[in-house]
Amino acid sequence: MSFVTKRNALISALHKAVGVPVLLASQVQPEAEPPLIVYSVTADYIPDGGLGNYSLGEGATQDDLVEVREEQPTATLSFTACSVNRCYDDKGSQVQVLGADEALELATLAQGFFLHTGRDAIAGAGFVVVDVTDATSRDALELDEMGRRFGFDVRLRYTRTDAAAISKLEKPTIKGNVKE
């Protein structure tokens, strides 16, 4: 399973857990209405310094050999919960939403997913949580108002597998004299 496939499964599970859109940052589609979470992959491959584990496997046919290399690097994803101050009508009464409070609660809920509640979904996506940072303010000025944002980073470990077809020698060709 590729890193992107694993990441998409993880993001889908997070979306189900928090109940708001979880969107990849810096995309060209219009941004959803708040509240929402945006994420970015700040590092998709941080090796641990090892060479990996090598093994031989069978290829497409019985005569093909494949050399398989596996390792367990880490990846860092950054999550930012976004909201704005706003009012809405709830059955005839005005309700005021403080964007900073909503963004912090959403960031805390997402942190809880990585710290505890989402452990089965995280493992099912092929990741193990290594570290979760604290949620800090990432407020940003949006035209005429402040976009209230709280964000945190998550470091995840996953298994990376690379495979390469290799040739095998049926009968070596020996040139020159062989001394016994």
Each model region followed by its residue ranges:
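Small/polar-rich, solvent-exposed N-terminal microdomains that initiate assembly or binding
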Residues: 1-66, 170-180
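Outer-membrane beta-barrel proteins
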Residues: 67-69, 142
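Oligomerization/assembly interface segments of phage tail-like spikes and tubes
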Residues: 69-88, 93-97, 110, 147-158
